[in-house]
Regions:
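Gly-Asp-aromatic-enriched flexible segments
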Residues: 1-93
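Beta-propeller blade signature
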Residues: 84-87, 298-304, 350-355, 401-413, ...
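C-type cytochrome heme c attachment motif
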Residues: 245, 335, 350, 384-385, ...
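Residue-level detector of Asp-centered blade-edge/turn motifs that repeat once per structural unit
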Residues: 254-255, 331-332, 378-380, 432-434, ...
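Hydrophobic beta-strand positions that form the internal "hydrophobic ladder"
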Residues: 259, 336, 383-384, 437, ...
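Short, conserved, GDST-rich strand-edge loop motifs in beta-rich repeat architectures
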Residues: 264-295, 341-342, 346, 385-402, ...
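Multi-bladed beta-propeller domains
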Residues: 308-322, 353-371, 409-424, 459-478, ...
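Solvent-exposed helix-loop boundary motif
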Residues: 310, 580, 657-683, 690-728, ...
Length: 813
């Protein structure tokens, strides 16, 4: 920046008033990797690094008369292009003003442009032409409208040309919406739903059967003329869609006629966003603590008149720019629980009545570093929430994403107790029809962690915690947003997704664990693909490129569901009624907005309250195994082989601590293993023992020489005073125990035989190095050709010489 007298100041020396970048934040004098900025081989001591699309606003204040800059792409980039302009206005701010005044028009334009900044600062019609071309390219047949665009290109008057391009964009976008809706017009599916709804009390079949007949007639006539400007074809298509909508929304399950949901105003990016812009986490491995905490325009809304001109009423809107997450409707149907930030930006769970009154926090806790989110009501008035109470972090990101485990909280006396002691995230606790708690648990220890998010269920006090679906399988990677089907003991609906890639949303699946507990065995159906078999697919980014994308389903019964969805890459996030017959019917969507977490407002039966079984005055739990040889864990192992069990506890990575891939070893586990001791196995394979409660315990069956035959690669946690029992080793959860007297059931529980040296960590230095010292270092002493196996010396990562020399010869997975 140069003044009139010729003096100058470097831009990096002037603080900017406003700065955004397409990735990370604008940086002064360094590139993305914190090295010196280099453009075309030239190093720059002064410079601003800003990833596209970026905007920087500097105060000029009449001091400067000239601005000079060299603009280019940093040499560390693999390629690309750069567009740079200095302006006296901020296009982003102007775009926001336009969006507030004209949301429909700006939203439609934003659907075909990557941001509005370039459009607002381009003096000719090139951006409008590009918008029209982009819109036409999305049509199945764009020839007619391509000719219209060519005619506009010959227009001499610039203002007329710009106006006609924008009018064309609007018309083609409306046609594209019609095209998209027709893709979800499945007459056979409508017939099947109609036949089912006829059986429901309150469905007026006589009223809607003529509409079904009209729909059949129009569908046979066809709608190809919509691409040629045929107004009759367009009218027929709209009429057919109106018939479909009327038939399906007449479903008596919607007679309550009210839906509560979260509404997000997202502006011109509404067609491009994914669910992190609607308050979810930006990945599939973190909890709400890693989601955005501010900068949202979100509210809880109630939608009514669902079959007509939908009415919207605000229930609650945060005043601090927080998102709205984890909506849960109480069984009384008059209030909702949700997650938002407090004034200090920490997450907490709150409640508000649907009439807008009664807003209050549901967890009151004085600890300054605890957060609570993803809560659920319990039938007895208590609540369960996810919390960072363990101060753990996800190991592969060095603890930068905090881990959340479940806590039980009583609003009456403000008492709290931790329920789960898991290595990584718990998600979405929800009450099943039998009063148990269903949730998703991510397991990370000693296994392929891309594919290990398991649906669990337990009693509300944490007892009887067992796998419900997915244990021991690699498909699906993740199952989120599980919700029990009304009237079913164990069936549920959920969203399957990947590990990396698309975050939180994915494919919508109905599960029935009574049919199978792994992979596709218990997957009853994918919605909306009634006739498409579900195939096992072991893939990291499981749902990348998959459409529709679903999130937050709510079952109305076992056939009809409310869900938030984005039907294709260019669609808005809206609310839909979907069913097992493949119908997908939009209830609500709006330009510039996104909707999530739809719940039908109705009173439902409160599940039974399961009394607490824990004995909080005890420090141990009892573990009973009827027959260690039952189940796939020890399949093929001859009876009598297992003589004892070795028990170890996991010590998990703490938040924001070094814990990455090579921190504990090379090709090793993520966690420190703390040896607790051994217990005997009876001749008939039965075992009974006591072990510390509230401790994640893993088990290794040992032979007569103390050698591990198998590895649990998971953990079990007993609550204080609980008797944890199982049939065998990773037995099928659908297997029924055969009543029989076993040796262990007639004995008192065994106490742990402590390991040599007492309870301690299991490490190379303590277990392996003493053997090398006794048997190997006479020759392997670093003096001859034999590699060195002496201990003691460590490198900068803490690895000893013997460990580094030996590890290539030992496969440990």
């Amino acid at each position: 920046l140069i003044k009139a007298d010729g003096t100058a100041v470097w831009l990096d020396e002037v603080p900017y008033e406003y700065g955004v970048a397409g990735w990370a934040k604008p940086k002064m004098n360094t590139n993305a990797y914190d090295h010196e900025i280099v453009i075309a081989g030239k190093e720059y001591k002064h410079g601003v690094f800003c990833h596209a699309n970026g905007t920087l606003v500097y105060p000029v204040g009449g001091q400067y008369v000239r601005f000079e800059a060299e603009v280019g792409i940093d040499d560390t980039s693999s390629g690309g292009s750069v567009f740079f302009q200095a302006l006296n206005t901020v296009p982003t701010f102007v775009a926001e003003e336009l969006n507030n005044k004209y949301p429909e028009e700006i939203g439609m334009l934003g659907a075909v442009l990557d941001g509005l900044d370039t459009w607002l600062i381009t003096p000719d019609a090139s951006v409008e032409k590009q918008a029209a071309d982009n819109a036409i390219a999305r049509l199945k047949d764009g020839a007619y409208y391509s000719n219209v665009a060519k005619q506009i290109a010959n227009e001499k008057d610039l203002n007329t040309q710009i106006r006609k391009y924008l009018e064309l964009v609007e018309k083609v976008q409306e046609l594209y919406t019609l095209q998209s809706d027709l893709e979800w017009l499945n007459v056979e599916a409508v017939k099947l739903a109609f036949a089912d709804m006829k059986k429901q009390k309150g469905y007026d079949a006589a009223k809607y059967e003529p509409m079904l007949n009209e729909l059949v007639r129009l569908e046979k006539k066809g709608f190809k003329g919509i691409y040629n400007g045929d107004e009759q074809a367009i009218a027929d298509a709209k009429k057919a869609l109106e018939c479909k909508r009327a038939i399906l929304l007449a479903n008596p399950l919607l007679d309550a006629d009210k839906i509560v949901a979260a509404r997000f105003k997202v502006g011109s990016k509404a067609h491009q966003i994914m669910t992190p812009s609607l308050g979810t986490q930006a990945n599939n491995w973190s909890n709400q603590e890693s989601a955005g905490r501010e900068g949202f325009d979100a509210e809880i809304v109630e939608l009514s008149n669902l079959r007509g001109d939908i009415q919207m009423r605000q229930v609650y809107k945060p005043k601090n720019g927080s998102s709205i997450a984890d909506l849960k409707l109480h069984w009384d149907g008059d209030r909702v629980m949700f997650t938002q930030t407090q004034d200090d930006k920490r997450w907490n769970i709150y409640e508000v009545n649907l009439d807008g009154t009664g807003f209050k926090p549901l967890v009151e806790n004085d600890e300054p570093d605890l957060e609570f989110y993803d809560g659920t009501y319990l039938p007895d008035g208590r609540v369960i929430a996810i919390s960072n109470i363990g101060y753990q972090g996800v190991p592969c990101v060095n603890g930068s994403d905090a881990v959340g485990n479940m806590v039980l909280y009583d609003p009456k006396d403000k008492s709290m107790r931790r329920l789960t002691f898991d290595q990584d995230a718990n998600w979405n606790p929800v009450i099943m029809n039998n009063g148990r708690v269903m949730y998703t648990r991510w397991e990370y220890t000693d296994l392929t962690h891309y594919y290990s998010r398991i649906v669990m269920h337990m009693n509300p006090d944490g007892t009887e915690n067992k796998a419900l679906y997915g244990s021991g399988a690699m498909f699906p990677n993740s199952t989120f947003d599980v919700q029990p089907l009304p009237g079913h003991g164990s069936a549920f609906v959920g969203i399957i997704s990947g590990h990396h890639g698309v975050a939180r949303s994915g494919r919508m699946i109905i599960f029935d664990p009574t049919k199978g507990r792994k992979s596709t065995a218990g997957m009853v159906q994918e919605i909306p693909h009634r006739n498409r078999p579900i195939k096992e697919e072991i893939k990291d980014q499981l749902v990348n490129g998959v459409w529709p994308q679903f999130i937050k389903p709510t079952p109305l019964n076992d056939k009809y569901f409310l869900v938030a969805a984005k039907l294709d890459p260019h669609a808005l996030w809206g609310l839909y009624l979907v069913d097992v017959y493949d119908n997908v019917t939009c209830l609500m969507q709006a330009e510039g907005e996104g909707y999530i977490s739809p719940i039908l407002v109705r009173k439902t039966k409160t599940p039974p309250s399961i009394p607490d079984r824990v004995k909080l005055n005890e420090k141990e739990a009892t573990f009973f195994i009827q027959d260690i040889y039952e189940g796939e864990g020890l399949k093929g192992i001859p009876r009598g082989t297992v003589k004892s069990l070795r028990l170890h506890a996991y010590e998990y990575a703490y938040v924001k601590t070094r814990s990455d891939h090579n921190w504990h070893g090379i090709q090793s586990g993520w966690d420190i293993k703390r040896m607790l001791g051994t217990v005997p196995v009876e001749e008939d394979g039965s075992v009974i023992f006591k072990a510390p409660a509230n401790t994640p315990i893993s088990i290794q069956p040992l032979d007569k020489d103390g050698v591990a035959i198998q590895w649990m690669r998971s953990w079990v946690t007993g609550q204080p005073g609980e008797v944890v029992s199982c049939i065998g080793c990773h037995e099928d959860q659908n297997q029924i125990a055969i009543p029989k007297r076993v040796i262990a059931s007639q004995k008192a529980p065994s106490a742990l035989t402590l390991p040599e040296g007492g309870t301690r960590s299991f490490t190379f230095d303590l277990e392996v190095q003493p053997i090398l010292d006794r048997a190997c270092i006479a020759c392997h002493n670093g003096e001859g050709k034999a590699f060195d196996l002496r201990g003691g010396k460590k490198d900068k990562l803490g690895y000893g010489t013997s460990y580094l020399n030996l590890h290539p010869y030992v496969h440990r997975q």
